[in-house]
């Protein structure tokens, strides 16, 4: 069974590994979509790598569709061909391990669909109907925000970075600081338009074609291409009280985070909860000011870190939403929440910003990094879901073990989520405990040798988790064997393979995930 499902994985070579591609069927270029295909070197080169800049794999062509129907035509052609070829949708290419690549196949430039008007439509609700937005899968979340705010509405859950596409995040899960209350973005989807691996165009929801609906949400692009998502909305606030609290003790930090996302506290507390970790010398040797912290703040935090035995400090990042009518009460509400917490005395930092400024906060950091040439660099990121019961072991073994002496460039996230806000009918994998931590090791390689060093550290992190039985799950996963994928999906694996047979029997879609090789239906059935 394992031999039949073996996968040709990309081999690391320096910063990039290169996958040799084959050819496309000649009659494709006589097909009706041929005029939308580009095969020139510049176009295929742009679709040959992603945000991670770790893996490179050249497609044979790039499709610039004017309509979703043209994508369906391409997929149907591949599925009916004697030699099916890979098809991978690409939005912003924000994957880190080549997940949006299509070696030897066709990359679909989903952003080309954005040229058409009317791809974001807001229904304000009323008369008992709840508000929602219909957004094309190619739309950036920043554009969805802009469109919904015109109606005084907004989605409930946001990723930290908004210059990524709707379909891209929904194919993974879409997590952020609001997810403890509302679940991931996929839990807030009402309906989808999907193109399956057979080339069928299907509208699905919890009640209509539910197998496809739950498969595609968090399905890593394995069962269909999302071309439209209907997403629930809520009234949008005008302002945000943005707070960061510093901790020198991890036990206190995690206890307070878990209190903040508990049902009792969250109903009257922060609307957003995340956390970050600062290691060792990053405060003293990093930037002297940030979009949030002033130079004076950073000097104080560096002093706190120097007094800590481990040199590690932790931040709870919280946000309270409010409007003009609740301005007078937000300070009282914040004071009430802070009285329940045990952050290091005097280390509370607040800012008052607009709702848009808060949601789009990473944009300012992006501008700074671009200006100094540190945005378009390799990003050997590793994102994990760590069981709440083992987060202190992870802290000791990784943050104060594997990373001892490290001076990472980038961000380390660490914050809890409630598992009961995830729908197990979806193929997306969450943490094992009732509460689990998101740990994002979002580090950048900025000098020669960094990629290899950071990859070794990532491998050491995974080895520690495996050897100690931590029970971590990868988010935005990447595995080097099908045994890894089998373990990742756990009890869902058999269902995942059944859904693959049903919706993409030739293994056409999103080959960059490297879950399945290109398979015939009979080979899949025999797994």
UniProtKB/Swiss-Prot annotation:
GO terms for cellular component: extracellular region. It holds the Pfam family FAD_binding_4. Keywords: FAD, Flavoprotein, Glycoprotein, Oxidoreductase, Secreted, Signal. Its cofactor is FAD. FAD binds at residues 91, 93, 95, 99, 160, 165, 171, 175, 226, 475, 510, 513. Residues 1-22 form the signal peptide. Glycans are attached at residues 121, 280, 323. One of its GO terms (biological process) is cytokinin metabolic process. One of its GO terms (molecular function) is FAD binding. It is found in: Secreted, Extracellular space. Belongs to the oxygen-dependent FAD-linked oxidoreductase family. Monomer. Catalyzes the oxidation of cytokinins, a family of N(6)-substituted adenine derivatives that are plant hormones, where the substituent is an isopentenyl group. This is Cytokinin dehydrogenase 6. It comes from Oryza sativa subsp. japonica (Rice).
